[in-house]
Amino acid sequence: MTEWLISNQFTDYNHSVKFMEAKIQQIYNNLSDELVWLLQHPPLYTAGIGATDDDIIEKLFPIYKTGRGGKYTYHGPGQRIIYLMLNLKKRNKCDIKLYIRDLSNWIINVLKHFNILGEFKEDRIGIWVNNKGVEEKIAAFGIRLRKWVTYHGIALNVSPNLSHYEGIIPCGLKDYGVTSMEKLGVKVSLCELDDILKQEFHKIF
């Protein structure tokens, strides 16, 4: 069984990491159900294991080092953070590439509800949209596994202040931009979005 937790207040980043680390240990020991956690962070940057100082342009917000994959990304209001704590071993899916593909298909299917065509790129993890001939990222992935239990996850841009990305080179990809559902003309509440996330999740996971 997979539980869902929705946090309506901004969640401190360090608190979220400590929570996830405790939770995945419980899941591994069969002391807790799997969990999908939906939240928002206050404005901040996170540095994945591939992050370098070259990707920082200006320190507009606090920077948190984290053990997830990837480089620098931004988190803040108007962005739906999706942290997934799933036991891939119990699901007989001990395949990281398959997990990333499943995450991608999930978000692509969610975006279809809003007439947004999301795309998965093998060489650029995340979900991309073609906005007037320009490829822009609408959802960033940063995952980590411990004993085949996942944590960290997805940042989906609903209506964030996109200028906040200007302090970094997002995911180390300087030739590509970022976008949001709002920028693409879609206005949706997080509550509405969460309902679709749940609906589509159960079709893949």
UniProtKB/Swiss-Prot annotation:
<dbReference type="InterPro" id="IPR000544">
    <property type="entry name" value="Octanoyltransferase"/>
</dbReference>
<feature type="binding site">
    <location>
        <begin position="140"/>
        <end position="142"/>
    </location>
    <ligand>
        <name>substrate</name>
    </ligand>
</feature>
<feature type="active site" description="Acyl-thioester intermediate">
    <location>
        <position position="171"/>
    </location>
</feature>
<feature type="site" description="Lowers pKa of active site Cys">
    <location>
        <position position="137"/>
    </location>
</feature>
<feature type="domain" description="BPL/LPL catalytic">
    <location>
        <begin position="30"/>
        <end position="205"/>
    </location>
</feature>
<comment type="similarity">
    <text>Belongs to the LipB family.</text>
</comment>
<comment type="pathway">
    <text>Protein modification; protein lipoylation via endogenous pathway; protein N(6)-(lipoyl)lysine from octanoyl-[acyl-carrier-protein]: step 1/2.</text>
</comment>
<dbReference type="GO" id="GO:0005737">
    <property type="term" value="C:cytoplasm"/>
</dbReference>
<dbReference type="InterPro" id="IPR045864">
    <property type="entry name" value="aa-tRNA-synth_II/BPL/LPL"/>
</dbReference>
<protein>
    <recommendedName>
        <fullName>Octanoyltransferase</fullName>
        <ecNumber>2.3.1.181</ecNumber>
    </recommendedName>
</protein>
<keyword id="KW-0808">Transferase</keyword>
<dbReference type="GO" id="GO:0033819">
    <property type="term" value="F:lipoyl(octanoyl) transferase activity"/>
</dbReference>
<comment type="function">
    <text>Catalyzes the transfer of endogenously produced octanoic acid from octanoyl-acyl-carrier-protein onto the lipoyl domains of lipoate-dependent enzymes. Lipoyl-ACP can also act as a substrate although octanoyl-ACP is likely to be the physiological substrate.</text>
</comment>
<dbReference type="InterPro" id="IPR004143">
    <property type="entry name" value="BPL_LPL_catalytic"/>
</dbReference>
<keyword id="KW-0012">Acyltransferase</keyword>
<dbReference type="Pfam" id="PF21948">
    <property type="entry name" value="LplA-B_cat"/>
</dbReference>
<keyword id="KW-0963">Cytoplasm</keyword>
<dbReference type="InterPro" id="IPR020605">
    <property type="entry name" value="Octanoyltransferase_CS"/>
</dbReference>
<feature type="binding site">
    <location>
        <begin position="153"/>
        <end position="155"/>
    </location>
    <ligand>
        <name>substrate</name>
    </ligand>
</feature>
<feature type="binding site">
    <location>
        <begin position="68"/>
        <end position="75"/>
    </location>
    <ligand>
        <name>substrate</name>
    </ligand>
</feature>
<dbReference type="GO" id="GO:0036211">
    <property type="term" value="P:protein modification process"/>
</dbReference>
